Amino acid sequence: MCTYEGRPIIGKDEGDGCEGIIRRYTGGTKLQPQARVESLNNAIPVIPLEYIKNWLEHSTILSEESLEGTPYIVGAADQRVIAGKGQTVYARGQGIEVGQRYAIYREGEPYIVTDAEGKKQNLGLELTQVASAIAIRGENDMSTLEITDSYNSEVRRGYRVLPEYDAMLPTLFYPTHAQDVTGGGQVIRVQGSIGLAAKHSVVTIDRGTVDGVQSGYVFSVNQKGQEIRDPKTNEKLTLPTERIGNIMVFKTFDRVSYAYVLDSELPMNLGAKLSPSVVDE
């Protein structure tokens, strides 16, 4: 993190440090030689964009209801089971228009949580974009698409087809207080891991825009203490909850958000609780 006119800013370090980050933030304003720009030690570090780019560009979370009736892949040319860049696939469903670009998504696991009353809730279904395609033919409810790009995965039957939109990737994030977020919150998924997060990891939290969360919000992560036996009395004890790190939200959805682990003294477990974190001004 760097400071500009007394305000903390976060951006991608492209090898030129805070001077370059601020120059890009100000639209090319050249810093005067006497201006002193320095990183904030022991504060929020610059986030390398490559750590979160995949989730910014190719991941989304939608309600299962919103996916009802959307087109899906039913096959590929030459009876292929999988398809990649430059190949042709067929989709079934209404709404595909010839000449338009589409994103092809693999469905992940839904976010199922238990609320305070013990009832299970579905907070959304995670979708990962595996390819981009353009519709080249259409007849009734069957469309032919040509895959123009693929992203580290093949296209398979059953994958969803949704409109593709150009997204401007943010290069700066502003760390801000999370005081107005609906109380509670926890880590409900660790991306790319079976359940432990560390520094530079991406996690999903069960708070989204309906709870007041915005990109840039910083939370402290508090981990419940272990259950142990008293060595003298053999009583079952729970060690105190400890603050173990900080995360910053970088992409929000209705009921969940993606966050980047800024720092972590211990591995973060699923269920680790969130609390507002104070951002140094």
What are these regions (language model features)?
Residues 1-281:
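Surface-exposed, polar/charged interaction patches used for macromolecular assembly or partner binding
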